[in-house]
């Protein structure tokens, strides 16, 4: 990435309370370059400019660390081009990651990025999330996604693979208060409830973001 994008990445992460060291910055930069290279051949993301990638993919992914900290096991459902799981893994290597997406080319990219970055404790799977319960029942401390539009559907998919005291984190691209209120009865029926809603502004953009943290009742 160009120097201004690297500076935005470092500054944006710091505003979220994440201090990136030189090695982490270099790994995030390598990941961004690999994303751009693959994106010229296959459609991984509509966000292609360096500064946009730095803020709307990398810093946005790292915002998950407001709610999640290692060690532990984390499942990212609908991870696409590796967001938020790969940036979070770079910064929190003690999180064991499983990343799933239904699009094979996106998982192929993730596997290549993981090899390039020498990340260990990271499994990328081309499966539908609905099929995970058999192999991964009650396996994860955190189940996260920034892909779901509907919180109850995400929670229903996450609960079978969540440890009893585990947490579900829905990353929302706007203030989530209204959606959370509307989902309350459906979550209650699933035996789950919202524990916390963390509203914030994505650094460098002015865009509203929310992390909705959910647990079992």
UniProtKB/Swiss-Prot annotation:
SUPFAM superfamilies: S-adenosyl-L-methionine-dependent methyltransferases. GO terms for cellular component: cytosol. Its EC number is 2.1.1.170. It catalyses: guanosine(527) in 16S rRNA + S-adenosyl-L-methionine = N(7)-methylguanosine(527) in 16S rRNA + S-adenosyl-L-homocysteine. S-adenosyl-L-methionine binds at residues 78, 83, 129-130, 146. The keyword Transmembrane does not apply. GO terms for molecular function: rRNA (guanine-N7-)-methyltransferase activity. The keyword S-adenosyl-L-methionine applies. It is found in: Cytoplasm. Its main location: cytoplasm. Specifically methylates the N7 position of guanine in position 527 of 16S rRNA. HAMAP family: 16SrRNA_methyltr_G. Belongs to the methyltransferase superfamily. RNA methyltransferase RsmG family. This is Ribosomal RNA small subunit methyltransferase G. It comes from Geobacter sp. (strain M21). The gene is rsmG.
